[in-house]
Amino acid sequence: VFIILLGTVNGANFTDGLDGLASSVTVLIATFFTVAAIGMGHNDLAAGIWPVSCATVGSLLGFLVFNVYPARVFMGDTGSLALGGFVAATALMLRLSLFIPIVALIYMIEVLSVMAQVLYFKMTKGKRLFKMAPIHHHFELSGWPETKVVAIFAITTAVCCLIGLVAI
């Protein structure tokens, strides 16, 4: 449980590096949890979670208006860490923690890319696996426009969330 919580919180924080990336990915994950909680029906815990999750979706959509490229408002560590905590806590309360690697795949990829970069750097005495970690910066340095990286990561998250909903 602790590893899931820590990994998700850090994954959300690592994802907050491009305009609109963390907020667009997290709004989709929060939508997944809203639909999942509503689908759980008469469960008292789920009945208390879906309004909070729905409010998170609404607040992120409002924030996203000002956070997309070129961003005028930035989330910062406080926001991204809080969103990671929200995702982890919601998954744990709904007993869907095994769904985090599916619906929050982007978070996991971001964390794993940083871990792989550090490990490879130490093992090869200074060589890099990626141009920069987390992986979204690698794509950006490879010439991808920031908006393309955000769009692809958001589409990937949407597909993963749909897979998660089908799996429930």
Residue ranges with predicted function:
Residues V1-I168:
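Alpha-helical transmembrane segments
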